[in-house]
Structures are given as C-alpha cells and as structure tokens.
Amino acid sequence: MNFEMPVETESNKETMEYLIKNSVNGMTYIQRFYRCVTNSSQIILVKTSREIQAKCQDDSKPYKLVPVGPLVQKPQDHDDDEKIMQWLRKREPSSVAFVSFGSEYFLSEEEMKEIADGLELSNVDFIWVVRFHGGSKVTSILEALPQGFLERTNGRGLIVDWAPQAKILQHSSTGGFVSHCGWSSTLEAMVYGVPIIAIPMQLDQPINAKLVVDMGVGMEMPRKNKELAKEEVASVIRRVVIEEGKEMRKTAKELSKRLKKEEDEEFDEAMKKLVQLVHESRINQVAASKET
C-alpha cells in the first residue's frame, strides 16, 4: 500500500512508534491495521469525504478507499445542556472560542496554565471543557487553573467538565474551536463550518492539523520544543475568532455546504459498492464449488 504522509515530521515518527510498540491481546496496533487491510477485498471504507481526502484516495493503490461521508451525528438534547446553551445565546455572533481536547488526552499542569493565561490575554469569550485524569492529584477546577483565573474571566468565560460539542459548534455564537484535532472533532468542525485552532497532541492529530491548515479552515498553534506559550495562545485565538475570522469562517462555511451536499451521495455509493462486493463474492463461491 502507498499511503502518502502529508509531511515528514517528528510527530509522524512518534505515531508509527506508538502503533508498533503498543498492543491489544498480543497484537500490535500496526499488525491489527495491516491484518484488516490484507483481509479486505480491495475496498476500504473510510469515515471521510472526497472533498477532504481526495489526494489520499488517489494514492492508495491497489486498494480503493471509499468515503462514506463524515458521519457526524446530529446534536442530541440532554437535560444538562440548557445552562451552557443559555450562556451561549447571550453572546454576539461568531464571538466565542470553544475549547475542548477530547476524552482521551489530559493537559499537563503547564499546558493548562498557558492555555488559561492565553484565554485571559485574548479577551475573547470562551467555553472551556476542563477534564482531569483519574490518577491526577488535581481533583477540582479551582486546583487546576491559575489562582484568580475564574474571577478575572468572570462574565466572559464558562468552565465546564462536559459540553454538548455538536450543539456548541452548530451555534451561531461560536467563532472558533480550540481542538486537539482528533478525527471526529475535526470532521464535526468542518461539517458545522467552524474554524479550528489546532493544538495536536498525539497519533494522527498532527496530520489532521496540517490538513485543516492546508484547506484554509484553521490555524495551528505555534509551539517551541512542543511547549505552549500564553502569548501565542492569545494571538492565534484572536486571529481566528476576531482579526482574520470573517474570511476563515467564510471558507469553513463553504466547505460545510459542500460536505452536506455530498454526504448522502457518498454514503449511498458506499452501500452500492458493498452490495456489489457481496454479489461478486457469492458468484465466486458458486464458481469455486462447481470446480470442486
């Protein structure tokens, strides 16, 4: 297979090392991946869109990558949504930065401090989902954040331990998404037309972040020796949400329209290919049984 990496980086090497060294049930992740691929019938269904991954689809011979669409779930209503959504409805259009790093990565104490200080310096309204690792010594939001942060950002910041991500991204007050660039989160932002402020942490996230930048729907946070700096955090958030936000949101909204337009078509095409594959498999089985 010839899956072309977008760019040769230290992050890509780290991703490969992770896949090679880590295992489940005695089989490494890279072994599981290749086993799935070699057992496939020349077709690999991918949670993506032609609009996003056209180059990768062209370079994957002899296997054909078939996009099934972003498969982004529609926002669900939950009882504890209302406080957050009520706060969001009071904000100006495209004025809020939504900050969330998914459910599998937990910020270090240093990262937490730089992001908090950066949000404070930016003067941009924000919703920040703050989570702690189960084994962490930190047990409360007050312990995790810089002293006085909540008081200094009172009125323009909302700190929560969970948030209805899809509903927030879909809301007109949301102007930017500070994200780790996990694939599902990246697709959600693209489908809802929200520019991404990328802070990739591990695995495929650096590759996803580069894709976001190349497509003109976000910016990656500059880091020196992988370390965040509050000044850069503030600067990039302001650029995406305020200073360059209008043009970037226009590009993101245009991409969103194209993705939604193609979504049903891509899914239907994928189902047709699966039906065809099953049909061909049955024909081959019948032919093989006649030969024996």
Cite the ranges covered by each PLM segment.
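Aromatic "clamp/platform" in nucleotide-sugar-dependent glycosyltransferases that forms part
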Residues: 182
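A short, small-residue-rich loop immediately preceding and capping a beta-strand
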Residues: 179
